[in-house]
């Protein structure tokens, strides 16, 4: 018969503790993606408006971004993150509400930076929508 050696081989995964993190908020017109990383850029947690249960046009609401930020923030709290630096990219409606949600969770926000890429007259933009 096979022996059950599971007790000696199984090791509990040790979570690293990180005191400072960087929040990358990518707010597009259709969705909001929130990623919390450590200082080196290794992802600790992430959440999206679509992953939070919102589909279609409800993904592009400030409330959906708030729910996604709360979900990512709760996982980051398990890593021991206390201070956050926020980097916001994109013109979407979830820019401000995601920062407010992280602030309400008890994180100390050290800085808020807008890192939206702006072309110096690079590629031609898409044609205007005619509705």
From Swiss-Prot:
<keyword id="KW-0694">RNA-binding</keyword>
<dbReference type="GO" id="GO:0003735">
    <property type="term" value="F:structural constituent of ribosome"/>
</dbReference>
<dbReference type="InterPro" id="IPR036967">
    <property type="entry name" value="Ribosomal_uS11_sf"/>
</dbReference>
<dbReference type="InterPro" id="IPR018102">
    <property type="entry name" value="Ribosomal_uS11_CS"/>
</dbReference>
<keyword id="KW-0699">rRNA-binding</keyword>
<comment type="similarity">
    <text>Belongs to the universal ribosomal protein uS11 family.</text>
</comment>
<comment type="subunit">
    <text>Part of the 30S ribosomal subunit. Interacts with proteins S7 and S18. Binds to IF-3.</text>
</comment>
<comment type="function">
    <text>Located on the platform of the 30S subunit, it bridges several disparate RNA helices of the 16S rRNA. Forms part of the Shine-Dalgarno cleft in the 70S ribosome.</text>
</comment>
<dbReference type="GO" id="GO:0005840">
    <property type="term" value="C:ribosome"/>
</dbReference>
<protein>
    <recommendedName>
        <fullName>Small ribosomal subunit protein uS11</fullName>
    </recommendedName>
</protein>
<dbReference type="GO" id="GO:0006412">
    <property type="term" value="P:translation"/>
</dbReference>
<dbReference type="GO" id="GO:0019843">
    <property type="term" value="F:rRNA binding"/>
</dbReference>
<keyword id="KW-0689">Ribosomal protein</keyword>
<dbReference type="GO" id="GO:1990904">
    <property type="term" value="C:ribonucleoprotein complex"/>
</dbReference>
<dbReference type="InterPro" id="IPR019981">
    <property type="entry name" value="Ribosomal_uS11_bac-type"/>
</dbReference>
<dbReference type="Pfam" id="PF00411">
    <property type="entry name" value="Ribosomal_S11"/>
</dbReference>
<keyword id="KW-0687">Ribonucleoprotein</keyword>
<dbReference type="InterPro" id="IPR001971">
    <property type="entry name" value="Ribosomal_uS11"/>
</dbReference>
